[in-house]
C-alpha cells in the first residue's frame, strides 16, 4: 500500500517545528519544502516562475499567491515528493490554502505545534550566538562552558536582533494574526473529512513530541 504523507506544519517561530520536521524527514524519507528555499532554487535555476518571482522581489513587491502556488505545485511534482512532503511556512493565508486546495493538492495531515508565547520568548531570548561560526547556545537549555563566551574560541557571544524579547513578541503577534484563521480553516477541513488535524504540545521534551508524531503518522 502506498503511503501518503502530505503534511503541513503550523507553529510559531521557536515552537520547535524545525527539530520535528527533521525527525519526520529522516523517519519517512520525505523532503521539507520551504517557500523561501523554493524561490531561491527557482531563481538560481532561471526557470520561468523564478524569473517572474525575481522581478517582483527586486522591486520589493510581494509575490502573488498564484505564483507561489504554481511554484509549490512545480516542486511537489518532483520525484522526491512521490510519497509526500512537509510544507513549512506555506500556506500562510486563507487565499493560499484555498489556492492549494483548488489546484488539486490534498493534504493528509496538518500538525500544529502549540507553545505559549511566554515560553517562546524565554526560548528565543535565551539564545546566544557566536557570530563567526554560527554556533548557538542557550543560557538555560544549552549554556556555554563560560558565560557569554564561545566554547571553541573563547570569543564573545551575541544576542541576535531577532531574538530580543520585543522583536519576538512582534513576530508572535504577526504569527497569531496570520495563523489563527488557518487553524480554524484546517480544523473545519478535518471535520469535513478532508484532512487530519493534530495539535501537539510543543512544551514537552523533544523525544516525547517525536514519539507522539511517530504514533500519529505510524
From Swiss-Prot:
* Domain remark in the UniProt entry: Consists of three domains, a large central CORE domain and two small peripheral domains, NMPbind and LID, which undergo movements during catalysis. The LID domain closes over the site of phosphoryl transfer upon ATP binding. Assembling and dissambling the active center during each catalytic cycle provides an effective means to prevent ATP hydrolysis.
Q: What is its EC number?
A: 2.7.4.3
Superkingdom, natural source = Bacteria
Alphabetized PROSITE patterns for the sequence: ADENYLATE_KINASE
Known catalysed reaction(s)?
AMP + ATP = 2 ADP
> Which region ranges are annotated with the description NMP?
34-63
Binding-site positions, AMP: 35, 40, 61-63, 89-92, 96, 160, 171
Q: Which family does it belong to?
A: Belongs to the adenylate kinase family.
Region of interest called LID, as start-end residue ranges on this chain: 126-163
User: Which InterPro entries does the entry link to?
Assistant: Adenyl_kin_sub, Adenylat/UMP-CMP_kin, Adenylat_kinase_CS, Adenylate_kinase_lid-dom, P-loop_NTPase
Subunit (UniProt): Monomer.
EC main group = transferase
A GO molecular function held by the record: adenylate kinase activity
Record localization = Cytoplasm
Binding of ATP: at which residues?
14-19, 127, 136-137, 204
Kindly provide the name given to this protein in its UniProt entry.
Adenylate kinase
Task: Output the GO biological process annotations, alphabetical, semicolon-separated.
Answer: AMP salvage
- UniProt entry tagged with the keyword Isomerase: no
Keyword field: ATP-binding, Cytoplasm, Kinase, Nucleotide biosynthesis, Nucleotide-binding, Transferase
Its function, per the record, reads: Catalyzes the reversible transfer of the terminal phosphate group between ATP and AMP. Plays an important role in cellular energy homeostasis and in adenine nucleotide metabolism.
Pathway membership: Purine metabolism; AMP biosynthesis via salvage pathway; AMP from ADP: step 1/1
NCBIfam families, per the entry: adk, PRK00279.1-1, PRK00279.1-2, PRK00279.1-3, PRK14527.1
* One of the record's GO cellular component terms: cytoplasm
